[in-house]
Design a protein with these regions (language model features):
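Aromatic-lined, polymer-binding surfaces characteristic
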Residues: 1-98
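CBM-like, beta-strand-rich accessory domains located in the C-terminal region of large
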Residues: 16, 201-384
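Catalytic micro-motifs at enzyme active sites that drive phosphoryl/nucleotidyl and oxygen chemistry
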Residues: 12, 170-173, 206
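Alpha-helical packing segments of well-folded alpha/beta enzyme cores
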Residues: 2, 6, 72, 101, ...
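Carbohydrate-active enzyme catalytic cores, enriched for enzymes
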Residues: 60-194, 198, 370
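Residues that flank catalytic or metal-binding motifs in active/ligand-binding sites
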Residues: 22, 149, 179-181, 215, ...
Length: 384
């Protein structure tokens, strides 16, 4: 009776995560009782529908949500192990889903072992799950450096992560944050540049704040986000007016990395395309960024800021002449500079831990958009 009720509830539920949990329960019921084979068939068919509805062509969640990626991988592995232990055939679509989810998981988590704060993610410890996968013999490899709209370039000491993906469809955008072209830098296992994280409680105003472009390490025009979100009643805010990624390039060589991309999120309202290229020179431990503001026909002049968020434990100091900002990250020292534009430090909010916030600092470049194409060049160099 309870499973029949669950089946009815699944049909009515809007949340795919709820469907996934219910699907697992129905499959377990079908495996546990000999005369309940119809539940197993129903559950496996539902699982196939979830894959078709929720995953893109690369097997990554259409929401682009990394927490959801982990959630799906855990449940697919669990269901596969139940089928194996009960000596039932394992459908190929389950193996394929685990293969693709595992490839993504090893790139966005296992290869760097630090949570990247994009699109609904916050700090969590996946070590127990890693041990669980290892104990069951699941080993994933990924030779690529891009998945789900995220690029991760790395060596033994440094990782550069950037969001080069368009926004998800409206129905998958509950946890989307307007951080197109935002980036994070990991240096010697510590986060040097970060995004501000995600406040998960959607009924709290901090949820909307954490979704804004200003809480990401990227460019903001006129204090507006690159995507317009709309809240319906007391539900999640969703993408109302989105953006498209209109170019992308990735280079990784031994002594030179580069990620380049552009989006049109400010084109309609302000007549500006944001084009960003970040270069890294491993031998010099130097990052050079080029934020290009490309003017379109409907250009409107207004203010802009480019923010570089820092974790709460990081200390900063601006030189008296205002030309440099020094960053102290434990035993590392870094120097930030930007010629021809004002740089400063401001206090913000960090949402890295689930449903909590604390003050942090961010470095920002400020200026006014010009009636011609602009290039804002900035540098971040390790000095100790």
């Amino acid at each position: 009776k309870q499973i029949n009720h669950l089946i009815n509830e699944i049909e009515r539920s809007e949340w795919v995560d709820d469907k996934m949990i219910g699907c697992a329960a129905i499959i377990l019921t079908g495996l546990s009782y000999q005369n309940k084979i119809r539940y197993l068939d129903f559950g496996l068919n539902l699982l196939k529908k979830i894959i078709k509805f929720s995953f893109d062509n690369e097997g990554f969640p259409k929401s682009r949500n990394i927490r959801q990626l982990n959630f799906y991988l855990k449940h697919f592995v669990l269901i596969r192990e139940w089928l194996k232990e009960s000596q039932n055939d394992i459908p190929e679509y389950i193996n394929e889903a685990i293969y693709h989810l595992g490839q993504a998981y090893t790139l966005v988590w296992q290869s760097i072992k630090i949570n990247i704060l994009f699109n609904g993610n916050h700090e969590s410890n996946n070590d127990d799950f890693d041990n669980y996968l290892s104990r069951l013999g699941y080993k994933f490899k990924n030779e690529n450096n891009e998945i789900g709209g995220y690029v991760i370039l790395k060596n033994k000491k440094t990782a550069l992560v950037m969001d080069v993906g368009s926004n998800p469809e409206k129905k998958f955008s509950n946890n989307y944050q307007s951080g197109a072209l935002s980036f994070e830098i990991i240096s010697e296992g510590k986060k040097l540049i970060c995004n501000s994280g995600f406040f998960q409680n959607y009924s709290h105003q901090l949820n909307d704040i954490s979704k804004s472009t200003a809480t990401h390490s990227t460019l903001t025009i006129d204090n507006q986000s690159s995507c317009k979100l709309r809240r319906l009643g007391n539900k999640h805010s969703r993408v109302e007016q989105g953006l498209k990624i209109i170019k992308k390039s990735i280079v990784i060589e031994k002594n030179y990395w580069s990620i380049g991309s552009a989006h049109d999120g400010y084109s309609k309202s302000y007549g500006v395309i944001h084009d960003r290229q970040i270069e890294f020179f491993p031998e010099q431990n130097k990052f050079i960024g080029f934020d290009k503001l490309i003017k379109k026909k409907n250009f409107i002049s207004t203010n802009f800021e480019i923010r570089f968020h820092l974790e709460p434990n990081i200390k900063t100091m601006k030189t008296q002449d205002g030309k440099f900002i020094f960053i102290e990250l434990e035993n590392q020292g870094w120097r930030f500079s930007c010629n021809n534009h004002k740089i400063d430090i401001e206090t913000g909010l960090y949402f890295g831990k689930k449903n909590t916030y604390t003050e942090n600092q961010n470095i920002f470049i400020s200026g006014v958009t010009q009636n011609e194409n602009q290039i804002i060049k900035w540098e971040l160099t390790k000095i100790t």
